[in-house]
């Protein structure tokens, strides 16, 4: 099902409002989002060694991502507070060996957040917030090593459940 081009956050008078979900069915929902952090070889090595001044970068980022999912409705004004029944945060190094710059290869960390609920509305924003928060935490913990890190490609990878149906990003989609 294609998304409706009209925003559901505006009423007939054009005023902002929170969408009324009282009439919707409770369904099992899952969303997967990801973010990438490009960093210097020194920053990547610090993560791999696990010996940064602030502690285990990935463990702290994982906790921050989970907390981010739980706080989404406080951060995004029109998000519903939904029961978050599961959140997982995974990290993997992206092989960018096809990059024109050999120094960039294997210095990109991908954070993937998966969130699940049984609710009347989706959990996409929670998974996006989790991935973003985890990536920001990696930046915070390594900024003394590399202030030029770049966070990009914060995006929804897939979602399932609900009236609008399932979504899965095309693997060839660069955006």
Swiss-Prot record:
It catalyses: (8S)-3',8-cyclo-7,8-dihydroguanosine 5'-triphosphate = cyclic pyranopterin phosphate + diphosphate. The active site is at residue 140. InterPro entries: MoaC, MoaC_bact/euk, MoaC_sf, MoCo_biosynth_MoaA/MoaC, Mopterin_CF_biosynth-C_dom. Disulfide bonds: none annotated. Pathway: Cofactor biosynthesis; molybdopterin biosynthesis. It comes from the Bacteria. Its EC number is 4.6.1.17. GO terms for biological process: Mo-molybdopterin cofactor biosynthetic process. Catalyzes the conversion of (8S)-3',8-cyclo-7,8-dihydroguanosine 5'-triphosphate to cyclic pyranopterin monophosphate (cPMP). Belongs to the MoaC family. Homohexamer; trimer of dimers. This is Cyclic pyranopterin monophosphate synthase. It comes from Rhodopirellula baltica (strain DSM 10527 / NCIMB 13988 / SH1). The gene is moaC.
């Amino acid at each position: 099902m294609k998304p409706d081009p009209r925003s559901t956050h505006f009423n007939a008078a054009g005023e902002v409002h929170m969408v009324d979900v009282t009439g919707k069915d409770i369904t099992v929902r899952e969303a997967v989002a990801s973010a990438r952090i490009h960093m210097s070889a020194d920053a990547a090595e610090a993560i791999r060694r696990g010996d940064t001044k602030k502690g285990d970068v990935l463990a702290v980022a994982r906790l921050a991502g989970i907390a981010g999912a739980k706080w989404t409705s406080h951060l995004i004004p029109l998000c519903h507070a939904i029961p978050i029944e599961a959140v997982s945060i995974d990290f993997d190094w992206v092989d960018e060996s096809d990059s024109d710059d050999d120094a960039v290869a294997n210095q990109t960390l991908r954070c993937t957040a998966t969130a699940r609920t049984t609710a009347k509305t989706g959990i996409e924003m929670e998974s996006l917030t989790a991935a973003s928060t985890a990536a920001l935490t990696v930046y915070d913990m390594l900024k003394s090593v590399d202030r030029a890190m770049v966070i990009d490609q914060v995006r929804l990878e897939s979602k399932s459940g609900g009236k609008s149906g399932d979504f899965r990003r095309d693997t060839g989609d660069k955006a």
